């Protein structure tokens, strides 16, 4: 399949998924709170792509949720090109993807994160994943969440869940705190074995995320919570901020490729605390 077609298919899927996820979120909010939409362009002097980020704040369920789509292209800086696969052979790049970060009002509902992307340099690959960060322990939620991920992965390859869970556990870890960010999930990168199969798996991950976040929210958003639990939530958000600013690949990639700062930092919670 021609690379132009691959890019178009990936780009169209990510944009469609943005619409689907935003619609689901607004339905959960009973359409009383809707997304603010902002389009942006990369590069002031030439067409280098751009994207659209959508933010919904102060809802009955979501304190802040961002759903970002982007399609950008251009040339890596000399300093950055050697850090990206294929960048040493061809400094030109194209990248498209969707990123979702949810910070909930109720401390019983965990923060949730999802992203998938397709990047092309001298060759192309998929990356992405999803993870959940509760501030209050819930072993039954953890077991259910990982079982859902395993079922989705097993539709494509029996080895994916174990492999991508391990990768997620290693990736979403704060070395300076010596603690994981949350209860894990799946994470994959540089996926380029078979384009059609890889793309099918990426679509599966996206639909699974939509179903998972809906189920978790409906189970938990009406539970009563205390001021103490809110304090725990705010401290846990502080850890979330630390990871995203210090270690997150997407944040680094966006800032190094002149992405939209507001869209890149949409993952940050509206309120957080440190002790």
Identify the meaning behind each predicted range.
Residues 6, 104-106, 122, 132-139, ...:
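A generic structural motif
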Residues 51-128:
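Internal mixed beta-strand/loop scaffold within catalytic domains of large alpha/beta enzymes
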Residues 78-80, 109-111, 138-141, 253-255:
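Short helix/loop capping segments that flank catalytic or ligand/cofactor-binding pockets
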Residues 94-96, 125-133, 179-193, 240-242:
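Glycine-rich, often proline-containing surface loops adjacent to acidic residues and nearby aromatics
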Residues 104, 251-275:
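Long, contiguous binding/interaction regions
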Residues 122-166:
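Compact, glycine/acidic-enriched structural inserts
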Residues 151-201, 216-218:
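Long, charged, mostly alpha-helical binding arms that flank functional sites
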């Amino acid at each position: 399949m021609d690379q132009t077609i691959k890019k178009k298919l990936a780009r169209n899927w990510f944009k469609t998924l943005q619409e689907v996820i935003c619609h689901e979120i607004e339905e959960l909010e009973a359409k009383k709170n809707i997304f603010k939409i902002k389009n942006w362009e990369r590069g002031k002097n030439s067409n280098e792509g751009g994207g659209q980020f959508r933010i919904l704040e102060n809802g009955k369920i979501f304190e802040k949720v961002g759903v970002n789509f982007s399609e950008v292209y251009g040339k890596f800086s000399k300093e950055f090109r050697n850090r990206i696969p294929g960048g040493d052979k061809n400094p030109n790049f194209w990248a498209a993807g969707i990123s979702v970060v949810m910070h909930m009002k109720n401390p019983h509902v965990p923060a949730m994160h999802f992203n998938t992307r397709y990047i092309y340099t001298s060759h192309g690959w998929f990356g992405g994943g999803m993870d959940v960060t509760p501030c209050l322990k819930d072993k039954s939620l953890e077991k259910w969440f990982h079982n859902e991920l395993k079922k989705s992965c097993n539709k494509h390859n029996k080895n994916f869940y174990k492999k991508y869970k391990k990768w997620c556990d290693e990736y979403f870890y704060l070395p300076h705190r010596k603690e994981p960010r949350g209860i894990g999930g799946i994470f994959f990168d540089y996926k380029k074995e078979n384009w059609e199969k890889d793309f099918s798996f990426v679509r599966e991950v996206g639909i699974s995320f939509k179903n998972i976040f809906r189920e978790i929210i409906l189970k938990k958003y009406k539970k009563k919570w205390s001021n103490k639990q809110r304090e725990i939530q705010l401290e846990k958000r502080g850890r979330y901020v630390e990871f995203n600013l210090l270690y997150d690949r997407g944040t680094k990639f966006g800032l190094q490729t002149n992405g939209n700062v507001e869209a890149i930092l949409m993952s940050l919670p509206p309120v957080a605390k440190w002790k």
